């Protein structure tokens, strides 16, 4: 793209009910260190503030700037690294000659906080950060989180709920005529009418509620430069309606051509099934080649127009984005607070790709990054790895090389690049498409070359792999390479469930595929004389899961011989297929009814079943088993989940044969499968996988957190 880049995360409420609380939080001084935060270590080699874009008038003066072209307001702290959307967007514009100033986590109760850099010449850019602000702030049970990894010192409370809307309105009140462009995961996934889990209702496009002029959705490298060039040429912002990857509002459709009309706001609020129909049309038009322009009507002759998606990046463009002159650190202003915790997760990790053709129903990536895989070149990745080895804090370990799915290193098929993705077919579900080119050799060679770099001791693969793709590979070279060199005792994969009915709704492969993968993994481990374990990620109360399926999952966990520490209760985040199912009660692809566990108590029971050994879950598990008609699982025999009487202090809730769950206790199995071995000497006798107790990653946020933020899984 000859200097055109960015992660469209610009790359992500009860406002009145929490107003007093928000005002208190908003008044905190950015960069102040909470009592629990460690002091930042002395690191004289860190980049100076001149390596970052301006965050103050003094910084502007040091560069000789009288005025910024753009001021970027973001809900995250300033980390100048390509895993942070704000950094990518601002560096892309900087590379094109635009002057960009940064205001991170302003006090949203004080208009003066967004005036510190003055009014920009061309406009304001706004994003909530690498995560949707509501997902960042609240757990699936709607309890406020106590920490914020994207804030200095990990202290929560420096970002408002629904940050894009709050920031947008604050700018509009302060600079009435300034163009406002919103983007990032929060704006992208709320670009049209969407279900909001936290208020349990349908909400309008965030473009309308934020007061913005243009919304960039998806990965916005192309769009942001086109918008900047148009504004720089003197085009009024209300005339910038032609750029792919953007959403705008209009009062007339007279000059809007070749569009599909979605159900109106009135239709959507009158009947949930209309939302399901609308969502299905939207997800069928997420491809840059085949996607149509979409129009969503609102009352009073207001129309929200979504232009077709922006073109995917070429490999050369991906390289340009990754190799812009990032400082690759948090801003020095955060040193006193101990830095930004999220940076530690990615400092020595490498993003090699974006996009995902896995298309899991509960994941937001299809709606944000698209299904066409975009890959950096081998040479670019190697250059970044060499850069990491020169960091004084590098200890020889590259923590991750991957993306949404690590072992995807090329588009699913050649057809996608010429004709676009299939509208009514998935690449991997219900089985691997016959046209798919399954090739893991490029990624395998990349891992080999990274291992050979001077100073590199080990390269980990933590992004997650798609095991059905690996099983479809005629060669087992990648899996052999993975378990011999790139697994640290545990390989995390995401079967998510064991019920084929639920797996079908999720868009995941059948249990048989997962069991076959586990058998192959164990066979190769025996061949190499290794003791490594598959650690499965599991989701409870996903649409399609009744109490029967939840009990099936609990029995599978019993047969693994260990208790998962990290269990993800289904979180209905904006604009996923699963969230549409949760809200409407139907599968939008077929319009067939689907069971949904909406009641918080039922969701708690389904989750407790997976962790039935925990004493605090005893009552919920017993109630769930009785509701499911499975009293046979209450007793003292080895197949039982719990005993007839509550556990005494120091005991687990588990039924007979499960031991105490402590080191040396006996595990238990029963289901047919690959064979399981519990952790720390516990003994199993069959089950879904060979597994070891592991905390895993916090997966409470939306799928893979949009572009490059947060944990990833496949």
Short names for language-model regions:
Residues 40-67, 77, 273-349:
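N-terminal [4Fe-4S]-dependent radical SAM core
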Residues 65, 72, 88, 103, ...:
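Conserved SAM/AdoMet-binding glycine-rich loop
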Residues 213, 321, 356, 381, ...:
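Conserved, mostly hydrophobic/aromatic
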Residues 77, 85, 104-299, 306-307:
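Glycine-rich beta-alpha loop elements in corrinoid/cobalamin-binding modules
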Residues 2-43, 419, 425, 642-714:
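Acidic, low-complexity intrinsically disordered tails
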Residues 109, 238-286, 302, 309-313, ...:
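Terminal amphipathic helices with adjacent charged low-complexity linkers/tails
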């Amino acid at each position: 793209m000859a200097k055109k880049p960015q992660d469209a995360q610009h790359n992500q409420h009860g406002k009145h009910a929490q107003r007093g609380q928000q005002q208190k939080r908003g008044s905190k001084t950015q960069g102040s260190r909470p009592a629990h935060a460690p002091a930042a270590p002395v690191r004289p080699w860190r980049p100076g503030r001149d390596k970052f874009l301006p965050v103050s008038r003094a910084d502007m003066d040091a560069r000789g700037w009288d005025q910024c072209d753009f001021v970027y307001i973001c809900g995250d702290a300033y980390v100048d690294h390509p895993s942070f959307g704000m950094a990518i967007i601002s560096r892309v514009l900087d590379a094109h000659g635009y002057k960009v100033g940064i205001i991170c986590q302003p006090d949203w109760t004080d208009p003066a906080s967004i005036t510190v850099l003055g009014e920009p010449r061309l406009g304001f850019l706004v994003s909530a950060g690498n995560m949707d602000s509501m997902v960042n702030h609240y757990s699936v049970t709607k309890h406020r989180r106590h920490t914020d990894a994207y804030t200095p010192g990990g202290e929560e409370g420096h970002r408002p709920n629904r940050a894009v809307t709050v920031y947008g309105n604050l700018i509009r009140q302060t600079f009435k005529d300034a163009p406002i462009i919103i983007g990032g995961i929060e704006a992208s996934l709320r670009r049209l009418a969407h279900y909001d889990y936290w208020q349990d209702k349908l909400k309008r496009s965030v473009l309308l509620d934020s007061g913005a002029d243009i919304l960039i959705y998806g990965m916005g490298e192309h769009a942001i430069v086109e918008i900047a060039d148009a504004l720089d040429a003197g085009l009024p912002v209300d005339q910038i309606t032609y750029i792919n990857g953007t959403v705008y509002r209009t009062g007339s459709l007279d000059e809007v051509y070749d569009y599909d009309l979605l159900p109106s706001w009135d239709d959507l609020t009158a009947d949930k099934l209309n939302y399901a129909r609308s969502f299905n049309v939207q997800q069928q038009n997420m491809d840059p080649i085949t996607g149509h322009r979409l129009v969503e009507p609102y009352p009073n002759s207001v129309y929200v127009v979504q232009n077709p998606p922006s073109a995917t990046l070429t490999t050369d463009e991906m390289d340009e984005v990754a190799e812009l002159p990032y400082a690759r650190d948090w801003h020095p202003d955060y040193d006193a607070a101990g830095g930004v915790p999220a940076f530690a997760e990615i400092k020595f990790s490498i993003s090699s790709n974006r996009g995902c053709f896995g298309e899991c129903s509960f994941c937001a990536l299809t709606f944000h990054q698209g299904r066409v895989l975009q890959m950096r070149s081998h040479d670019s990745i190697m250059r970044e790895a060499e850069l990491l080895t020169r960091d004084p804090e590098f200890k020889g370990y590259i923590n991750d090389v991957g993306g949404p799915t690590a072992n995807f290193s090329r588009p699913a098929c050649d057809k996608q690049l010429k004709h676009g993705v299939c509208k009514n077919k998935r690449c991997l579900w219900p089985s691997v498409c016959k046209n798919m080119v399954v090739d893991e050799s490029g990624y395998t060679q990349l891992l080999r070359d990274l291992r050979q770099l001077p100073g590199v001791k080990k390269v980990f693969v933590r992004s997650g792999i798609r095991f059905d793709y690996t099983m479809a590979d005629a060669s087992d070279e990648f899996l052999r390479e993975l378990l011999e060199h790139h697994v640290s005792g545990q390989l995390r994969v995401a079967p998510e469930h064991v019920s084929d009915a639920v797996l079908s709704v999720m868009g995941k492969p059948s249990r048989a595929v997962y069991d076959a993968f586990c058998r192959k993994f164990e066979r190769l481990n025996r061949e190499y004389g290794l003791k490594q374990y598959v650690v499965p990620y599991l989701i409870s109360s996903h649409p399609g899961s009744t109490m029967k399926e939840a009990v099936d999952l609990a029995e599978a966990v019993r047969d693994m011989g260990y208790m998962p520490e990290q269990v993800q209760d289904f979180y209905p985040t904006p604009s996923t297929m699963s969230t549409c199912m949760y809200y409407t009660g139907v599968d939008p692809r077929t319009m067939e009814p689907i069971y949904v566990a909406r009641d918080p108590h039922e969701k708690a029971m389904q989750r407790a079943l997976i962790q039935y050994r925990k004493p605090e879950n005893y009552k919920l598990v017993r109630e769930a088993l009785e509701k499911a008609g499975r009293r046979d699982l209450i007793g003292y025999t080895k197949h039982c989940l719990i005993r007839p009487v509550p556990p005494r202090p120091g005991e687990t809730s588990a039924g007979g044969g499960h031991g105490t769950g402590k080191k040396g206790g006996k595990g238990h199995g029963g289901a047919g499968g690959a064979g399981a071995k519990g952790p720390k000497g516990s003994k199993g006798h069959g089950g879904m996988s060979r597994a070891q107790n592991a905390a895993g990653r916090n997966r409470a946020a939306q799928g893979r957190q949009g572009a490059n933020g947060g944990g990833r899984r496949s």
